[in-house]
Design a protein with these regions (language model features):
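Helix-coil boundary/capping segments in enzymes
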Residues: 1-303
Length: 303
């Protein structure tokens, strides 16, 4: 028996909806709209050495999840095949012969992305953070916490300005929020609802010793349900390293591309979302708010 190798990209007779697209954020995604006194307390990128990728900081501390600018040094489209075949740089990164994502128009510009979506027959896309999924847990630390909500608000205003929340019916930017301070969270939630947000990204895991489905947070969940927002849990930085990796003698906050096997298992992929979803169910969140919708994205499905 012989097989015929496909020489063309398979085509569909309909356009698709893509629920996991990303942009690469500009350096000022946190600082553009933040109050002046927080500009050096939020996420910023040191580009004093033009010969190396930018070094990411949260305040005066190196960013834990991304050591360099998230878009500075990435694998080119199609590199995952080489990664799976072992054709990678030392250390196993899929970034062999990397490119700068910030230099690719459709990675950073909504109009260019729409043109690419038209070319690829993508009707609409859920547009998610890249840098954004790695910052919030570090900002929870006591030394950074005063900049947490100013940073979240500033990021959301940048997103609203550069990508939008889906008013065009095609690119649905998903703002971020944190439940660390319930009152602050509800205030920003109301602003996002008025601005037209349809999706909302939260970090998996507990919040300062409370389960996210604790009735304490019901004022937040009630408004989310009433407004019809969709909650998104996307793989990224979480509190799980501190909770589970550290007691095993492992690093609580390794860089995203340098997890050991055990760190990966305990704190990075399926464990955070599995524990979070089980917690929401066990706390009867969906019994109290049956119209809530939650998306688990890039967290696997083996669980």
């Amino acid at each position: 028996m012989t097989t015929t190798q496909r020489t063309q990209t398979p085509s569909l007779d309909y356009w698709i909806h893509d629920a996991d697209q990303h942009y690469y954020e500009p350096d000022d995604c946190y600082s553009r709209h933040i109050e002046e006194r927080f500009k050096k307390k939020t996420m910023w990128i040191d580009r004093s050495n033009p010969d190396t990728p930018g070094r990411m900081y949260v305040g005066d501390e190196r960013c834990q999840f991304f050591s360099v600018g998230a878009g500075d040094n990435i694998g080119a489209p199609g590199m995952m095949k080489a990664f799976l075949q072992g054709a990678t740089e030392e250390g196993g990164s899929p970034s062999l012969n990397p490119i700068n994502g910030l230099s690719v128009p459709e990675f950073v510009d909504a109009k260019a992305r729409l043109a690419r979506m038209d070319e690829q027959r993508v009707e609409s896309s859920l547009m998610l953070p890249t840098t954004g999924v790695g910052i919030e847990p570090q900002l929870r630390a006591p030394k950074h916490r005063e900049a947490l909500y100013p940073s979240v608000r500033a990021f959301n205003r940048w997103l609203e300005e550069d990508w939008g929340y889906g008013q065009d019916g095609r690119i649905f930017g998903a703002p971020m929020l944190t439940l660390v301070d319930l009152d602050e969270a509800v205030v920003e939630l109301e602003r996002l609802i008025k601005a037209g947000a349809r999706f909302l990204v939260l970090t998996t895991g507990p919040v300062d010793g409370r389960a996210p489905g604790d009735p304490y947070f019901d004022p937040f969940w009630s408004r989310v349900e009433e407004a019809g927002l969709n909650i998104v849990f996307h793989i990224g930085n979480t509190p799980f390293g501190e909770m589970y990796s550290k007691p095993w003698g492992l690093r609580p906050a390794p860089p995203s591309h340098r997890h050991s096997l055990m760190e990966y298992f305990l704190a990075f992929t399926e464990r955070p979302v599995m524990d979070t979803v089980v917690s929401l169910i066990a706390d009867n969140l969906f019994g109290r708010f049956p119209k809530l919708r939650v998306l688990s994205i890039e967290y696997g499905s083996g669980w």
